C-alpha cells in the first residue's frame, strides 16, 4: 500500500505517533500566533534542520512534498510585491512553508497503522456515547482494499474505450465504472455477512 | 488452408513495466489466418495482445498491422484491429445493446443514424434483432460475451485479437461462440490457456519470459508446450 | 449494516480514484479534476449522513498519510495548507447535497440531484474554501474569492455529471442509492 511514509529511517520514526501529533498541533498554533519576519525565518531554519538530520535524500523528498504549496507562495509574494507590502507577504509565505513542512514531516515519519491506532484511540470516548468504533477501523481497511480494485476496473474500461476510439475516454465511462464498483461492494458485503458481519458484536 | 493475409509485424519490440522486462526484442510476422499464443501467466501474452491492438506503446521497436502503426495512428488502427477482452463487464460501456454496438461505428466517423443502422444490421446478422433496446444488465454472461463480439465485428476490422475470450463460460456457450468465430473471414489471434481451442489453428507461438520459446504449426508447438508444462513441478507453479 | 458500511467505504474509495483521473483543461485554461464530482456523488447517492461519513472517511485516510487527493497529495500538510478550507467544506458539501436530495423526495431524481450537487458543491464548498484561504493566506474574503472563481464553470459541469450518474444508478442499482431508500 502506497503511503507517504518515508522508507528512509529517521530518528523521528520511533517516536510515538500521538506525541508527534501533539507536538505538531502545538507548533502549528505557535506559528500562527507569531507575526514577525524574524520568527518565521527562524522557524523555517529550524524545520529545515529537522529535515536535514536524516540526510539529504530525505530532505529532498520533503521538498517534493511541498510542491503544491509553491504556487500559493508565488501568488502571495507576487500580490504583496505589487501592493508594496513585501514584508507581510514574506511572513505569510514563510509561515505557510514551515507549517506544511512540519506537518509533512510527521506524515513522513509515522507509519499508517500507527496513525490508525491514534485515530481509534481519539475516537474511543465515543464508545461511552454508544457509538461503536470497531466498524470505523474496518471501514478504513475496506477503503484501502477498494482503491486498487476500483482503479484496475476503471483502467480496464478505459482501455476498452480506447480499443474502439481514437479519442480519450469520455464521461460515459463513469457509469459502467460506478456499476462494477457497486457490484464489487455487494460481493464484499456478502462475504462479510458470511463471516459473521457487524451485528454479532 | 493458409492464405496470405494482412500481416501483423513486430520489429524488435520490447516492453518494460518499471524495472521488469515483459517482452524482449520480439520480431514476428504473423500472416496466417488463425494464430494462437500460449504461455504461462506472466509470460507476456496479454501484453502482446494489447501491443497488437495498439493499446500499449512499445519501449523499443514498432508494431504494424496491415501497414498501420497501431500505436500512433489510432484512427486507422481502430479500422484495422479489434480486441476482445476476457471479462465483458470490463468492456461494455453503454447501458443498452444498440448503444454499445453503435459506439464503435460513431468513433469510425458514421453519423448517429448510420451507426444505429449498422448496429441493427449486426444484430440481425446474429438473429438478435430484439436485443436493440435491451439493457445489457439483464443479459446472461454468455449473451454479454456475444454483445462484445458483435461490438468488435461491427467495426469490420481485418484482425481481431482475442484475450482468453471464453473464460467462465459453460461448454455449449463456448461451442456456440467458437462456431461464430471460426466462420469469420478475418484474421484471429487468440491468446488462450485452452489448448483444445487452438488445435485447429494454422500457427501457434509459445511465449516464455517475454521471448518466443517455440513457433510453428499448431500441433508441433502445442506438443512442445504441453510437454514442457508437464515438466514444471509444483514449486514453480504460479502460487 | 454491512452493505451500508461497504457502500460508504466504496464511495470513499471512489473519491480517491476520481482524483487519479487525468485533469481536464477548460477552454479558459483552468484545470478541473474529477474529485469534486466524487464529493457530490457521496451526497446525492448515499444521502446526507452517510455521504458525509464517506467523505470524512476519505479525509481521515488522507490525514493518515495516503496520497489520495488529486495530484497525489496527502498527509497532514494539506490540512494546514491553503486548501484546508475546501477539505473542511468537503463533508459539509456532501451533507447538504444529500440533504437536498432526501428532502426533495417528490422531485425527479435528476433535478433533485442536480440542485443538490450545485448547492452543496459550489456555494457551500466554496464558502469554506474561501474562508480557509483567507485565514492561511491572510487575505480578505473577497480577495480569496477572486482566486477561485475560474473554477466554478468546471464545477457546474461536474454537478451535471453527478446528477446524471445518480439518476442512472437509481435505475440500474436502486438498492445502492441510499438517499432515496
Language model feature labels by segment:
Chain B
Residues 53:
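Helix-to-loop junction immediately C-terminal to a conserved catalytic motif
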Residues 160-164:
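Catalytic Walker B motif of ABC-type/P-loop ATPase nucleotide-binding domains
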Residues 113-131:
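Conserved ABC ATPase "signature" region
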Residues 135-139:
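Conserved ABC ATPase signature
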Residues 211-235:
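Conserved beta-strand-loop-alpha-helix hinge in the C-terminal portion
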Residues 61-72, 77:
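Conserved ABC transporter NBD signature motif
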Residues 8-10, 22-23:
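Conserved structural motif at the start of ABC-family nucleotide-binding domains
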Amino acid at each position: 500500500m502506497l503511503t507517504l511514509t518515508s522508507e528512509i529511517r529517521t530518528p523521528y520514526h520511533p517516536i510515538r505517533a500521538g506525541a508527534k501529533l501533539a507536538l505538531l498541533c502545538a507548533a502549528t498554533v505557535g506559528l500562527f500566533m507569531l507575526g514577525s519576519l524574524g520568527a518565521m525565518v527562524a522557524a523555517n531554519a529550524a524545520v529545515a534542520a529537522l529535515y536535514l538530520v536524516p540526510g539529504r535524500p530525505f530532505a529532498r523528498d520533503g521538498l517534493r512534498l511541498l510542491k503544491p504549496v509553491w504556487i500559493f507562495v508565488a501568488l502571495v509574494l507576487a500580490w504583496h510585491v505589487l501592493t508594496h507590502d513585501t514584508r507581510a507577504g514574506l511572513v505569510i509565505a514563510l509561515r505557510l512553508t514551515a507549517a506544511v513542512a512540519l506537518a509533512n514531516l510527521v506524515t513522513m515519519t509515522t507509519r499508517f497503522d500507527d496513525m490508525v491506532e491514534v485515530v481509534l484511540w481519539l475516537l474511543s470516548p465515543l464508545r461511552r456515547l454508544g457509538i461503536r468504533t470497531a466498524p470505523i477501523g474496518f471501514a478504513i481497511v475496506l477503503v484501502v482494499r477498494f482503491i486498487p480494485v476500483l482503479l484496475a476496473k476503471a483502467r480496464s474500461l478505459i482501455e476498452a474505450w480506447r480499443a474502439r476510439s481514437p479519442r480519450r475516454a469520455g464521461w460515459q465511462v463513469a457509469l459502467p465504472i460506478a456499476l462494477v464498483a457497486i457490484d464489487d461492494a455487494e460481493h464484499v458485503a456478502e462475504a462479510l455477512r458470511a463471516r459473521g458481519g457487524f451485528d454479532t458484536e | 488452408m493458409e492464405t496470405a493475409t494482412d500481416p501483423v509485424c513486430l520489429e524488435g519490440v520490447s516492453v518494460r513495466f518499471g524495472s521488469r522486462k515483459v517482452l524482449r526484442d520480439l520480431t514476428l510476422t504473423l500472416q496466417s489466418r488463425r494464430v494462437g499464443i500460449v504461455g504461462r501467466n506472466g509470460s507476456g501474452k496479454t501484453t502482446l495482445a494489447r501491443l497488437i491492438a495498439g493499446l500499449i506503446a512499445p519501449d523499443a521497436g514498432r508494431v504494424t498491422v496491415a501497414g498501420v502503426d497501431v500505436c500512433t495512428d489510432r484512427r486507422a488502427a481502430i479500422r484495422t484491429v479489434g480486441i476482445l477482452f476476457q471479462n465483458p463487464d470490463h468492456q461494455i460501456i453503454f447501458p443498452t445493446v444498440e448503444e454499445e454496438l453503435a459506439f464503435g461505428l460513431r468513433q469510425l466517423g458514421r453519423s448517429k443514424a448510420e451507426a444505429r443502422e449498422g448496429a441493427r444490421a449486426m444484430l440481425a446478422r446474429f438473429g438478435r434483432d430484439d436485443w436493440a433496446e435491451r439493457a445489457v444488465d439483464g443479459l446472461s454472461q454468455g449473451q454479454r460475451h456475444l454483445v462484445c463480439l458483435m461490438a468488435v465485428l461491427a467495426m469490420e476490422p481485418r484482425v481481431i485479437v482475442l484475450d482468453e475470450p471464453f473464460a467462465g463460460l459453460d461448454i455449449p456457450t463456448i461451442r456456440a461462440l467458437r462456431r461464430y468465430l471460426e466462420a469469420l473471414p478475418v484474421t484471429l489471434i487468440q491468446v488462450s490457456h485452452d489448448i483444445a481451442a487452438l488445435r485447429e489453428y494454422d500457427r501457434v507461438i509459445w511465449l516464455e519470459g517475454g521471448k518466443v520459446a517455440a513457433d510453428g504449426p499448431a500441433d508441433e508447438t502445442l506438443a512442445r508446450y504441453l510437454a514442457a508444462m508437464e515438466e514444471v513441478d509444483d514449486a514453480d507453479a504460479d502460487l | 449494516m454491512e452493505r451500508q458500511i461497504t457502500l460508504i467505504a466504496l464511495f470513499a474509495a471512489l473519491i480517491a480514484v476520481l482524483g487519479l483521473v487525468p485533469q481536464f483543461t477548460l477552454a479558459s485554461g483552468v484545470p478541473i479534476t474529477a474529485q469534486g464530482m466524487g464529493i457530490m456523488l457521496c451526497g446525492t447517492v448515499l444521502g446526507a449522513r452517510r455521504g458525509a461519513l464517506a467523505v470524512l472517511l476519505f479525509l481521515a485516510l488522507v490525514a493518515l498519510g495516503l496520497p489520495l487527493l488529486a495530484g497525489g497529495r496527502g498527509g497532514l500538510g494539506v490540512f494546514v495548507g491553503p486548501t484546508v478550507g475546501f477539505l473542511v467544506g468537503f463533508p459539509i458539501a456532501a451533507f447538504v447535497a444529500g440533504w437536498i436530495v432526501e428532502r426533495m423526495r417528490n422531485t425527479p431524481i435528476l433535478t433533485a440531484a442536480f440542485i443538490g450537487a450545485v448547492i452543496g458543491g459550489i456555494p457551500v464548498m466554496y464558502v469554506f474554501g474561501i474562508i480557509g484561504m483567507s485565514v492561511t493566506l491572510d487575505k480578505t474574503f473577497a480577495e480569496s474569492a477572486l482566486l477561485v472563481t475560474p473554477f466554478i464553470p468546471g464545477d457546474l459541469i461536474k454537478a451535471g455529471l453527478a446528477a446524471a450518474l445518480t439518476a442512472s444508478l437509481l435505475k440500474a442499482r436502486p438498492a445502492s442509492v441510499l438517499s432515496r431508500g
